[in-house]
A protein has these predicted regions:
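Nuclease-adjacent, charged terminal/linker segments that flank catalytic cores
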Residues: 1-17
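Acidic-basic catalytic patches of nuclease active cores, encompassing PD-(D/E)XK
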Residues: 17-76
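Glycine-rich, often proline-containing surface loops adjacent to acidic residues and nearby aromatics
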Residues: 28-36, 104-107, 145-149
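Short, well-structured alpha-helical interface segments that form or flank functional binding sites
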Residues: 46, 50, 54, 83, ...
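Short, well-ordered amphipathic alpha-helices
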Residues: 55-60, 88-92, 135
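Secondary-structure boundary elements
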Residues: 61-65, 95-98, 139-143
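Active-site metal-binding core of divalent-cation-utilizing nuclease and nuclease-like domains
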Residues: 69-104
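Catalytic cores of nucleic-acid endonucleases
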Residues: 108-154
Length: 154
């Protein structure tokens, strides 16, 4: 009989480092999405959900997923959380699947390129309804790390 605790990767000292580097890879690929959007002729309107949906269109496209080695990931919009909705859920699938609660979150907010104080408006929203939601456990964090996207708008 095999001892299941030996096969549990969570006991491995570098398991958190592996998860963090995996998420770093995902976020680096999101930078490639940004460049693809910039280089496309697609019109981007000043609306958080619309911008997020353009990102998701790339992240859910099979050709893009093959090119950037994202086939083992499922990207979902508007994931219901403890007390709100996070913009993008990244669920590892296939070999990396743990369970439906084991996912990364990406919260998206617009940032104002003109009002840089962050005391009111969009920049305050980024802090209050973005960063603070992660810091206060408003959003779950199975892997201990999540991300914020700031869409700079005029």
């Amino acid at each position: 009989m095999i001892n299941n605790s030996i096969l549990n990767a969570a006991c491995f000292g570098y398991s958190q480092t592996r998860r963090d580097s995996y998420f770093e890879f995902i976020l680096t690929t999101c930078v490639d999405v940004y460049y693809a959007i910039i280089n496309s002729s697609e019109e981007v309107i000043n609306n958080e959900t619309s911008i997020r949906d353009i990102f998701l269109k790339y992240l859910q496209c099979l050709a893009f997923k093959k090119k950037y080695k994202l086939r083992n990931l499922k990207f979902d919009p508007e994931t219901l959380e403890n007390r709100g909705r996070a913009d993008i859920r990244v669920l590892p699938a296939k070999d990396d699947y743990i369970d439906d609660e084991a996912y990364y979150l990406i919260e998206c907010k617009r940032l104002n390129s003109k009002n840089l104080t962050g005391e009111c408006g969009l920049n305050a929203e980024y802090v209050i309804n973005g960063i603070c939601r992660f810091a206060s456990n408003y959003y779950s964090s199975h892997f201990g790390c999540n991300a914020m996207f700031g869409f700079v708008v005029e």
